[in-house]
Design a protein with these regions (language model features):
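Acidic catalytic motifs of isoprenoid enzymes
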Residues: 1-183, 190, 194-230, 238-248, ...
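A glycine-rich phosphate-binding loop feature that marks nucleotide/adenosyl-phosphate handling sites
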Residues: 253-258
């Protein structure tokens, strides 16, 4: 379900591309240092958005540098680090673990079990460090699994379940920005879930998998789906624009106002081609 909240790369300036890559590399670097290199398999640009948002809001001091790694061994890549990069790395590991565990328990995917077993030793520390967020992830995964087994025909229920998860992830601490971050996260989570349901409609139909639009007996309706998405993103943007963001604002705007739509339409085009 992750992988949609990313930038439209072609629309970024060279400086924005460099910054975006440095944040991503910083998260990757922290995942390796704080857990295991295997955890980098779960690395997602969605968490780069989370880090960028919190960094723009709280403006922390940053450590930066350049370093080559196994994935990029020829040319050193720039990276940045701060407490929000580390937070995004922790959330990436936690989400990766519970997602893999769910894939193993529900679908019997052996690769998912292997990765979950590798990440499991790091969960107690994450639960101690971020009890609210880890509790929200567990609750969301459990809730979504239950709704899928019930073949829930109401898209609002699973969308709101995922919205609660994103609300908790965006709220780094309980402060004056927590309300706006939480409501932004809730709407963003609903957007992601509904986007994923629309993007995977044809694939889920072919494979007989749960999809709320299929469960409610809905035929493919691109126009209606996009109306749902515009509404959810509109509510997300309303809260987003209340935040006093300056640093990386253009990059964040690109992700929310362009990147998510480019990714959605690309996925729908791909699925329609596979269905045809």
């Amino acid at each position: 379900m992750f992988g949609y909240v990313t930038a439209s790369w072609k629309e970024l300036t060279a400086q924005e591309q460099k910054r975006y890559g440095a944040v991503y590399c910083g998260i990757c670097r922290e995942i390796r240092q704080r857990s295991t290199g295997v955890g980098r398999i779960c690395l997602s640009y969605d968490m780069a958005f989370l880090a960028l948002l919190l960094m723009s809001l709280y403006e922390p001091e940053e450590e930066s540098g350049k370093k080559a790694c196994r994935l990029h061994s020829v040319k050193p890549r720039p990276w940045v680090d701060n407490e929000y990069i580390r937070y995004a790395a922790d959330m990436n590991v936690a989400l990766g673990y519970y997602n893999c565990l769910d894939d193993w328990q529900d679908d019997g995917k052996r690769a998912a079990k292997f990765l979950a077993d590798k990440l499991a030793p790091f969960l107690p520390e994450l639960e101690n460090r971020w009890p609210r967020q880890l509790g929200a992830i567990q609750s969301c995964i459990s809730g979504l699994s239950r709704l899928e087994k019930e073949n829930c025909p109401n898209p609002d229920e699973p969308a709101s379940c995922f919205g609660e998860l994103m609300a908790q992830l965006l709220v780094y601490r309980e402060d004056m920005w927590a309300k706006d971050l939480g409501q932004m996260g809730f709407s963003l989570g609903r957007f992601i879930y509904l986007l994923d349901a629309a993007a995977d409609y044809d694939k889920d139909k072919r494979k007989g998998k749960y999809n709320p639009y299929l469960a409610m007996g809905m035929e493919r309706d691109e126009k209606r789906w996009e109306e749902y998405l515009v509404l959810a993103m509109g509510r997300c943007a309303e809260r987003y624009e209340k935040l006093p963001l300056v640093q990386d604002k253009a990059l964040l705007d690109n992700i929310l106002y362009s990147g998510v739509w480019v990714n959605y339409r690309g996925k729908r085009k791909e699925e329609a081609a596979n269905d045809g």
